[in-house]
A protein has these predicted regions:
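Metal-dependent catalytic neighborhoods of phosphoester/phosphodiester hydrolases
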Residues: 43, 103-109, 143-144
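Cell-envelope and extracellular/periplasmic
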Residues: 66-71, 93-106, 115, 122, ...
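Charged helix-capping and loop-helix junction motifs
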Residues: 107-117, 153-159
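Structural recognition of the beta-strand scaffold that forms the well-ordered cores
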Residues: 30-33, 62-67, 91-95, 130-134, ...
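Serine-esterase "nucleophile elbow" of acetyl-processing enzymes
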Residues: 1-69, 74-75, 79-88
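Catalytic His-Asp segment of secreted/periplasmic serine-dependent ester chemistry enzymes
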Residues: 137-229
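A short helix->loop->beta-strand "cap" motif at the edges of active sites that frequently abuts
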Residues: 124-129
Length: 229
C-alpha cells in the first residue's frame, strides 16, 4: 500500500535541476524515464548520445533526453510539471516500472502513476503522440532461485498485458516492444527463452546496456518513431 512506500521523491533533485539549467527545446520528442535513458549518451558512461542515434530523416535534432537515475513511476509523475510541461513535446516516450518494485510499489500503483502522466500529457498538449516502453529483458533476471525468477517474469507479463489493454483503448498511445526483440537474444529462435538473453550487450551489473546494447536499441526506437522522424 502507498503508506508503506518511503521513497524520497526528491532524491534525484540534482538531476532534475541539471536538466532545468539546459536550454528548453520545444516541439521535440521527449524521452522521460529511468536509467535506460539516463545512460544513453551520459558523459559519465561514454556512450554515444541518444540525440545522435535518433534524428530526423533530414539529419536535424529530434529528441530531448530527460532520463534520470533510479526513478520510479511516482517520481516521473512528481517531476512532470518541471521536466515535461515546459518543453511542450510533440511526442512523449516514457519508460517506467523497472525500479518500482524495489521501493514497494505494486503493479497497479505503477500503472496508475503512468496513466496519470499520459492523461496530463494529452490534456496539456492536444494531439501529442504517446509511447510507452516495455521493461526490457536482461540477464540479471536469471537467478538460481526459481521463485524469484518466476516472480519477475510474471510481473513483466502482467505489466505488458496492462499496457496493451491501455493502448487498445487509447489510439494516441503505442507500446515500444522490447521483451521479444530477436536482437536481444542469443539467436532469433531463442525469443521467449529468457535464460538466453544476450549477456554481451550488458555491463557487469547485467541490468544496463553497454554501447553494443544501445547499438541495437537505436534502430528499434527509430522504427517505432518512424512516422515522427
Amino acid at each position: 500500500m502507498l503508506f508503506n512506500i518511503e521513497k524520497n521523491l526528491k532524491s534525484l533533485e540534482d538531476s532534475v535541476v541539471a536538466y532545468e539549467q539546459e536550454p528548453i527545446e520545444k516541439g521535440k520528442i521527449l524521452f522521460y524515464g529511468h536509467s535506460l535513458f539516463t545512460r544513453w549518451g551520459s558523459p559519465k558512461y561514454g556512450y554515444r548520445r541518444m540525440d545522435e542515434d535518433i534524428r530526423m530523416k533530414d539529419g536535424s535534432l529530434a529528441v530531448v533526453n530527460h532520463g534520470f537515475g533510479t526513478s520510479t513511476s511516482e517520481e516521473l509523475l512528481y517531476y512532470y510539471p518541471r521536466l515535461v510541461r515546459p518543453w511542450e513535446p510533440r511526442a512523449l516516450v516514457i519508460a517506467t516500472l523497472a525500479n518500482d518494485g524495489m521501493y514497494g510499489y505494486d503493479m497497479m500503483q505503477s500503472m496508475q502513476n503512468l496513466v496519470k502522466i499520459l492523461h496530463w500529457a494529452r490534456t496539456d498538449f492536444p494531439g501529442i503522440k504517446l509511447f510507452v516502453v516495455e521493461d526490457h529483458p536482461r540477464p540479471s533476471l536469471i537467478t538460481s532461485v526459481p521463485q524469484k525468477w518466476n516472480g519477475a517474469l510474471h510481473k513483466s507479463n502482467e505489466y505488458r498485458q496492462l499496457l496493451q489493454a491501455y493502448a487498445q483503448l487509447h489510439p494516441d498511445t503505442k507500446i515500444i516492444e522490447l521483451w521479444n526483440q530477436p536482437e536481444l537474444f542469443e539467436t532469433p529462435e531463442d525469443v521467449g527463452d529468457y535464460t538466453k538473453v544476450r549477456k554481451d550487450i550488458f555491463v557487469e551489473d547485467k541490468v544496463h546496456p553497454n554501447q553494443a546494447g544501445y547499438d541495437i536499441l537505436g534502430p528499434i526506437f527509430r522504427k517505432a518513431l518512424d512516422e515522427l522522424l
